[in-house]
A protein has these predicted regions:
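Extended, low-hydrophobicity, polar/charged segments
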Residues: 1-197
Length: 197
């Protein structure tokens, strides 16, 4: 599967979903440069692997072993997990490297929360305006009540670039991690908590 990397938003947005266009509007309004890949829905490992290869993604182990001068060309493609406590009174969006193992008990201990589980599709739509497979840090732009707490695994911050969906799983974006932390997250008005998983 061959994918083409494009700079910025699509030239023609008439066929794009409104939630995706809002992401491009936000990124453009705050001066964030980003690369974009359009692809089949990222529901299979074949599609995810093709996106990862196009963006130059390495495994976490390869990334940590890489000479720091060579890291700049690689992006950490995140899996974004939408979590909640048992009572569904607290919601969390966790950004973690795609190949990093996630254990809920490790995270629960760090954020002083009771047992965590995955939030349902209805909560994804209500708080982030996304569907399963499309969860993204960029969905926080739709959390106007600031209900969702952003959690970022410290390994995400080690790469010069980070990859995520623009609230739809038929496109993927790559942007500088510095822009994510210094421009995007402040614009989303969701103060992150850094965790070590």
């Amino acid at each position: 599967m061959t994918l083409t990397i494009y700079k910025g938003r699509p030239g023609n947005i008439t066929e794009r979903q409104e939630r995706e266009v809002r992401v491009y509007d936000l990124l453009d309004s705050i001066g964030v440069d980003y690369d974009r890949l359009d692809h089949a829905p990222a529901m299979t490992m074949e599609v995810c692997d093709a996106v990862n290869a196009a963006f130059g993604r390495m495994t976490l182990e390869e990334f940590k072993a890489e000479d720091s001068n060579d890291r700049t060309k690689h992006a950490i493609i995140c899996k974004n997990l939408f979590l909640c406590n048992r009572q569904k009174t607290k919601f969390y969006l966790l950004m973690i490297p795609g190949d990093k193992k996630f254990l809920t008990k490790n995270l629960s201990a760090q954020i002083n929360s009771a047992r965590l589980s995955f939030a349902g599709e209805e909560d994804m739509l209500n708080f982030l305006d996304v569907t399963p497979g499309s969860v993204s840090v960029l969905g926080l732009m739709n959390d106007h009540g600031h209900i969702v707490q952003l959690l970022i695994d410290s390994d995400v911050l080690q790469s010069e670039y980070v990859g995520c969906h623009p609230c739809i799983n038929t496109s993927s974006l790559r942007m500088k991690t510095k822009d994510l932390m210094e421009k995007v997250i402040p614009a989303l008005q969701h103060e992150p908590v850094i965790v070590n998983l």
